[in-house]
């Protein structure tokens, strides 16, 4: 099972749904974990009986909302071994969740931001406050791109 972290204050929900859709089309079983403060996936992805923490399916993608770590997800699905997913996409915007989901041990981590001051400053603050060092690839978003 591959674990991929998406870190930063920028909203990553739509991007993760698009990545997950590509991965499921390639026959991968994918779980998106929304561990962000706002939990936007709760409002974007339909759920029949939403509770404080739950897993719902949307277009062959499973989405976990409200969990503090992978162990809570294992408990929810009733397993003590590894989860049955090929890929975990973990969306995080706090130091606590980065540590709880052990993203320092992830196969890959991406720092996702745009050029707005909030996303940049909050993202830098987040990275500065981490206890464990992370190897990151940055992704920048902009509404308008220059043709160069």
Language-model region placement:
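Conserved catalytic-core segment of NTP-binding enzymes
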Residues: 87, 92-148
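Surface-exposed amphipathic alpha-helices with a cationic face
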Residues: 24, 78-82, 127, 131
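P-loop/Walker-type NTP enzyme "switch/lid" segment
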Residues: 2-17, 21, 31-86, 93-96
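Solvent-exposed, non-transmembrane amphipathic alpha-helical segments
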Residues: 24, 43, 50-53, 129, ...
């Amino acid at each position: 099972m591959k674990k991929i972290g998406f870190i930063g204050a920028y909203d990553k929900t739509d991007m993760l749904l698009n990545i997950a859709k590509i991965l499921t089309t390639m026959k991968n079983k994918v779980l998106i974990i929304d561990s962000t403060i706002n939990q936007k996936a709760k409002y974007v992805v339909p759920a029949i009986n939403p509770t404080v923490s739950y897993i719902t399916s949307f277009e062959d993608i499973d989405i976990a909302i409200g969990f503090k770590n992978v162990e809570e997800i294992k408990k929810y699905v009733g397993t003590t071994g590894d989860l049955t997913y090929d890929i975990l996409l973990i969306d995080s915007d706090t130091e606590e969740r980065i540590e709880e989901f052990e993203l320092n041990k992830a196969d890959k981590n991406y720092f996702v931001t745009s050029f707005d001051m909030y996303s940049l400053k909050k993202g830098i603050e987040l990275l500065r406050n981490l206890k464990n060092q992370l190897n990151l690839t940055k992704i920048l978003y902009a509404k308008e791109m220059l043709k160069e």
